[in-house]
Curated annotation (Swiss-Prot):
Residues with PTM Phosphoserine: S59
The STAS domain, residue ranges: 4-110
CDD domains: STAS_anti-anti-sigma_factors (cd07043)
Cross-referenced Pfam families: STAS (PF01740)
Lineage: Bacteria, Thermotogati, Thermotogota, Thermotogae, Thermotogales
Function summary: In the phosphorylated form it could act as an anti-anti-sigma factor that counteracts an anti-sigma factor and thus releases a sigma factor from inhibition.
Regions annotated as coiled coil: none
Organism, as annotated: Thermotoga maritima (strain ATCC 43589 / DSM 3109 / JCM 10099 / NBRC 100826 / MSB8)
Keywords assigned by UniProt, alphabetized: Phosphoprotein
InterPro entries: Anti-sigma_ant (IPR003658), STAS_dom (IPR002645), STAS_dom_sf (IPR036513)
Protein name per UniProt: Putative anti-sigma factor antagonist TM_1442
Length: 110
């Protein structure tokens, strides 16, 4: 992935996916593929996407999040966005996507 890194930690009933780097048209399809594969194979019921290290996301990134949310629901899992920077939070609010995602301030709250 172009300057995008994923670290996955499974704890208790959830899997925490820490994303580092920007989510944009250059890397969103690879991010989508990796998350879809993970969601379909993990036994954890909660998937928490820790976005604390993501400062930029474009429309391709938003589309990827929507696809992952749908995949999670199909697989009987809860998909949670966590630790959003103000710039990402603002984009989600402007597009009204904050209404369809569960969003927490911290990973621990998820």
């Amino acid at each position: 992935m172009n300057n995008l890194k994923l670290d996955i930690v499974e704890q208790d009933d959830k899997a925490i996916v820490r994303v580092q780097g920007d989510i944009d048209a250059y890397n969103s399809s690879e991010l989508k593929e990796q998350l879809r594969n993970f969601i379909s194979t993990t036994s954890k019921k909660k998937i928490v996407l820790d976005l604390s290290s993501v400062s930029y996301m474009d429309s391709a990134g938003l589309g990827t999040l929507v696809v992952i949310l749908k995949d999670a629901k199909i697989n009987g899992k809860e998909f949670i966005l966590s630790s959003l920077k103000e710039s990402i939070s603002r984009i989600l609010k402007l597009t009204h996507l904050d209404k369809i995602f569960k969003i927490t301030d911290t990973v621990e709250e998820a």
